[in-house]
Amino acid sequence: MSKLNIIFAGTPEFAAQHLQALLASQHNIVAVYTQPDKPAGRGKKLQASPVKQLALQHNIPVYQPKSLRNPQAQAELNALNGDVMVVVAYGLILPEAVLHIPRYGCLNVHGSLLPRWRGAAPIQRAIWAGDQETGVTIMQMDAGLDTGDMLHKVSTKIEADETSASLYMKLAKLAPPALLAVLDGLTEQQFKPEKQDNQLANYAEKLSKQEAKLDWNLPAYQLAQNIRAFNPWPMSFLTVEVEGVEQHVKVYQATVLAHQYHAVGTVLQVDKNGIQIATSEGVLNITQLQPQGKKPMSVQDFLNGRANWFSLGKKL
């Protein structure tokens, strides 16, 4: 096992947890690449990414180019003499020229069992599609979008109540040891590259706020999957008219019930156990929700003072 000089590229907390694991290893982090500071909070002050904050705590040089396509940025990277570049949720596209700069190329930690769910939102789309399991893939990057050779996979079950938030945390614990195993065996080529089967590939499109609105023409099981997949962002929501004003209500938890046919979007039952709404297939029973300007709450708490919002027979 040889000590490697690693260039790390990542931005969010998920990436920072990988950097933390690398800092605790025998390997040497020669530099960190992360996205430029962005305005955040009510004051819109520039805020450093979690990866940058961690790197500065450990006195690691930080680079924040807006792009890696220009020759100057590539020359800077080349001068670092890295053995390998580790890329985790960086957010910038790496041009092909960059992929060949480090001695062992660029490794990527991807949040799915490739070739399933290539693309921007693999964790969320696995839940959205009703997958029973997912995991992480450590891959050798190439010029395509998550199309490189796979070096190592680790899988985990997707629980029935799993949200993207909980799965994100699960993979953040699962992935760093898998990455370290690959790095520790890199010089001896302990992990043999495996080609991806393009016929099994699908694409994890980015989530949108428009997609988060609950569509009662979808089956109840799909809406329940959406609610879990879109938590913590963009959060599934419904709209309901109350005294002539359209109210937006975020939905945090729901279960699926069977039913005989009813007109879609009809409120069928309202009690402390849930708000039951007819869909094209089955009933969605909403059990936790959040009115605008309030915290998430149980149906029982929601109905205190809002009992008229979801009257029986009301069409949403």
Swiss-Prot record:
Any GO MF annotation of the entry: methionyl-tRNA formyltransferase activity
Pfam families: Formyl_trans_C (PF02911), Formyl_trans_N (PF00551)
Keywords assigned: Protein biosynthesis, Transferase
Chain segments annotated as coiled-coil in the UniProt record: none
Catalytic activity: L-methionyl-tRNA(fMet) + (6R)-10-formyltetrahydrofolate = N-formyl-L-methionyl-tRNA(fMet) + (6S)-5,6,7,8-tetrahydrofolate + H(+)
GO cellular component labels: cytosol
InterPro entries to which the protein is assigned, alphabetical: Fmt, Formyl_trans_C, Formyl_trans_C_sf, Formyl_transf_N, Formyl_transf_N_sf, Formyl_transferase-like_C_sf, GART_AS, Met-tRNA-FMT_C
Enzyme class per UniProt: transferase
Entry EC no(s): 2.1.2.9
Role this protein plays: Attaches a formyl group to the free amino group of methionyl-tRNA(fMet). The formyl group appears to play a dual role in the initiator identity of N-formylmethionyl-tRNA by promoting its recognition by IF2 and preventing the misappropriation of this tRNA by the elongation apparatus.
Family in the record: Belongs to the Fmt family.
PANTHER family with a match to the protein in the record: METHIONYL-TRNA FORMYLTRANSFERASE, METHIONYL-TRNA FORMYLTRANSFERASE, MITOCHONDRIAL
Annotated protein name in UniProt: Methionyl-tRNA formyltransferase
